[in-house]
Amino acid sequence: MGAPYDFAPERPDHIQQILDGLDRYNPETTGVFQDYVMQQCESQTYDCYANLALLKLYQFNPHLSRDETVTNILVKALTMFPSPDFALGLSLLPSHLLAPLNSSAHNPAAGDAPLSEAVQKLNELRNLLEGADYATFWSTLDSDDLYADLIADVSGFEELMRVRIAATVSQAVREVDRSILESWLNLEGSDFEHFVGSVCGWTIEGAKIKVPMNKDNEAKGTVVRENVKFDQFARVIKRAYEQPA
């Protein structure tokens, strides 16, 4: 049985107390939650439940919202791909932030980009990940200085994304071409070999990468049996011949 959705092993006691009581709806706790988001970014920890509680506070108190904190929450949610955390975060944002912008009319410097543009940029990355278009994910990430600004606060973002992509790949295949996996992980040479061998525990055999068998990538036949009683089948036949009222 998996851990509860609101569980976070690294959650501090004072955050747990806020989440367990009515103070989670108290605007005065906004600053505490914001500091906790920054702590997660720096320490490579993650607490979806607390982050969603902060976004809910922003919903009720939009004047307290901080753009940087919102984007940091979404970037942290990306590092948990393929979980639905990013979509949950989007659902708590104002609808106008999700409306497409006219790129010709909105082309500010990276540091001055509006929150709506930042949210849509991150959503584009999410869509690429969900579509398993990992090579385009990396090229898109490198295509705009705004992306560099958005992920700057999240320590180890690229490494975290490689781990998540590798985990997803291991659920689907047992062998993959080296060139393809290099594009998926955005790594080459010794860096690629170290990640594949030491981090993933996979084997490099020439131009192929071997992924160990696991419960997800093992090919197994499935037999499904359905027991239908004769009287149930008879009722279906009878209804087929009944005249409509």
UniProtKB/Swiss-Prot annotation:
PROSITE patterns: PCI. It is found in: Cytoplasm. SUPFAM superfamilies: ARM repeat, Winged helix' DNA-binding domain. Disulfide bonds: none annotated. InterPro entries: ARM-type_fold (IPR016024), CSN8_PSD8_EIF3K (IPR033464), eIF3k (IPR009374), PCI_dom (IPR000717), Transl_init_fac_sub12_N_euk (IPR016020), WH-like_DNA-bd_sf (IPR036388), WH_DNA-bd_sf (IPR036390). Keywords: Cytoplasm, Initiation factor, Protein biosynthesis. The keyword Flavoprotein does not apply. One of its GO terms (biological process) is regulation of translational initiation. GO terms for molecular function: ribosome binding; RNA binding; translation initiation factor activity. One of its GO terms (cellular component) is eukaryotic translation initiation factor 3 complex. Component of the eukaryotic translation initiation factor 3 (eIF-3) complex, which is involved in protein synthesis of a specialized repertoire of mRNAs and, together with other initiation factors, stimulates binding of mRNA and methionyl-tRNAi to the 40S ribosome. The eIF-3 complex specifically targets and initiates translation of a subset of mRNAs involved in cell proliferation. Belongs to the eIF-3 subunit K family. This is Eukaryotic translation initiation factor 3 subunit K. It comes from Phaeosphaeria nodorum (strain SN15 / ATCC MYA-4574 / FGSC 10173). The lineage of its organism: Eukaryota, Fungi, Dikarya, Ascomycota, Pezizomycotina.
